[in-house]
Regions:
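Hydrophobic alpha-helical transmembrane segments of multi-pass inner-membrane transport and secretion
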Residues: 36-63, 300-334, 358-371, 418-426
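Short helix-loop junctions at transmembrane helix boundaries
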Residues: 367-415
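C-terminal membrane-exit region of the final transmembrane helix in multipass inner-membrane proteins
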Residues: 403-447
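Hydrophobic, regular-secondary-structure patches
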Residues: 57-140, 163-169
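Transmembrane alpha-helical interface segments in multi-pass membrane proteins
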Residues: 326, 335-380, 415
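Hydrophobic secondary-structure segments that place a key small or acidic residue at a functional site
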Residues: 123-124, 137-144, 159-241
């Protein structure tokens, strides 16, 4: 049997230590409720701070998730493969070789890629002039495969008049609402699209001279409105085959292949795999952060701003807690003097104050979690209608749906609780030190 040591008077030191600790815990809990009003107000302040932190983080992550999703679906996708140098120059002369497009298609058919891939959209990009009987407008031409584009892009979902492109209507074109307003056209109107033909060396295309101006007659099939000025006033979609014929590009060649993934977090992995597969080809494989650096920078700045604001809120809550606990300590100097006179050591006094703070923090965290998660659940299911904040419509620079949904992860919840708990614990050290250093003569002067 294990032996236990006893002191000279027959007492058990370990048992006394445990009893003393439990007694301090009991006293700390009772002290918390000596001033119920102050306790509840402090718990309310700290709980509201945690709830506000959880709500803001949930809406922040949800907003960023929606912004990224909309950005990539209005833009070049989560991952884009294009000719080397196209990102910097934007030259319509830079096309993906047919063999590269074939290699990409083979790679995308592998089992690992099928699991992460949502859709693929080959695109041919160029600039041109769109004219009607009333006016003309410079536009960005995007040749797409209607079936593929409809599955991944948001533009087919933002039609305000007419319908999106279809395979059985090769002469159809869809244009932005601002383009339609400038050209004074409506559904069914005839427009002429003019652009400069391109041709890669060594290719045989229909009678098209490189650099020659080409034009074609099209009919407005649909009008879309995205809320993004740069898209609505500039972008037009037409069938890929029509764009290839107009530009004198072989059927197998496109400007870029846009990949859309089920999870944004897989972007880097997919990009690395494609870079290995296409290492010898004159192409560049970019994630959305590289193809849309402005969007990535805006999200980064928004993250930083929100962290600063959350830090300010927590600092204000922390100062309030410090003030409350410190006032409690100063009001109880006589009590601490009596405790010291009865033999309570400074360390035990400090432990008692820290125990009070931890008990108060535990109650605050429970309240904050209940309140924060309840409100977050509402925002996650019903969403926050941003139109209530902007009265009418969203600013054209915001790439968001009108309804913002919260996305609060478990890691965010755990980290928030840990941060608030550590903050409250550290704050309690100074009042505890103040109580431990109470001098008996000074404490009795309170009388």
């Amino acid at each position: 049997m294990a032996s236990r040591s006893f002191s000279a008077d027959g007492s058990d030191p370990q048992g006394l230590a445990v009893t003393s600790f439990l007694l301090l815990v009991k006293v700390s809990w009772r002290n918390v409720w000596r001033n119920p009003r102050g306790t509840l107000l402090t718990a309310l302040a700290l709980g509201l701070g945690l709830a506000l932190l959880l709500i803001s983080l949930g809406l922040l992550d949800g907003g960023h998730e929606q912004t990224i999703a909309n950005g990539v679906r209005f833009g070049p996708g989560h991952v884009v493969i294009q000719a080397k140098g196209f990102q910097d120059s934007g030259s319509q002369e830079l096309l993906l070789p047919a063999r590269v497009v074939s290699t990409i298609n083979e790679f995308l058919q592998t089992e690992p890629m099928k699991r992460v891939l949502l859709g693929v959209s080959p695109r041919l990009l160029a600039t041109g002039l769109l004219s009607s009987a009333a006016n003309s407008a410079g536009v960005t031409i995007i040749g797409v495969i209607p079936r593929e584009e409809r599955a991944v892009s948001l533009i087919p979902q933002r039609m305000v008049a007419g319908k999106y492109l279809s395979d059985d209507n090769p002469a159809g074109i869809v244009i932005g609402a601002e383009v339609a307003r400038k050209l004074e056209v409506k559904i069914g109107s005839k427009v002429v699209l003019m652009t400069q033909a391109v041709r890669q060396p060594g290719t045989k295309v229909k009678d098209v001279t490189p650099g020659e101006m080409q034009s074609t007659l099209l009919r407005v099939n649909g009008i879309f409105r995205t809320g993004i000025e740069g898209v609505d006033a500039n972008v037009i979609h037409l069938p890929l085959s029509v764009a290839q014929t107009l530009l004198g590009v072989p059927d197998q060649q496109v400007t870029q292949v846009a990949l859309f993934l089920r999870q944004e977090g897989d972007s880097l992995m997919v990009a690395k795999g494609l870079r290995r597969q296409l290492a010898a080809a004159p192409v560049e494989v970019l994630t959305w952060r590289e193809s849309m650096p402005m969007l990535a920078q805006i999200l980064g700045l928004d993250h930083a701003f929100n962290y600063v604001m959350n830090g300010v809120v927590l600092a204000m809550v922390g100062l309030g807690i410090l003030n409350t606990i410190l006032m409690r300590v100063l009001e109880r100097r006589y009590e601490f003097g009596v405790c010291k006179a009865l033999g309570l050591r400074p360390v035990q006094l400090a432990v008692m104050i820290i125990g009070e703070s931890l008990a108060l923090t535990a109650m605050s965290l429970a309240f904050g979690l209940a309140l924060g998660l309840s409100i977050d659940h509402y925002f996650a299911t019903s969403g926050l209608d941003l139109r209530l904040l902007f009265r009418t419509s969203l600013p054209s620079t915001i790439v968001l749906d009108p309804i913002l949904y919260s996305r609060l992860s478990v890691s965010r919840i755990v980290s928030s609780v840990i941060i608030v708990f550590i903050m409250a614990t550290v704050i309690s050290f100074y009042p505890a030190l103040k109580a431990a250093r109470t001098e008996l003569p000074d404490a009795l002067k309170v009388l």
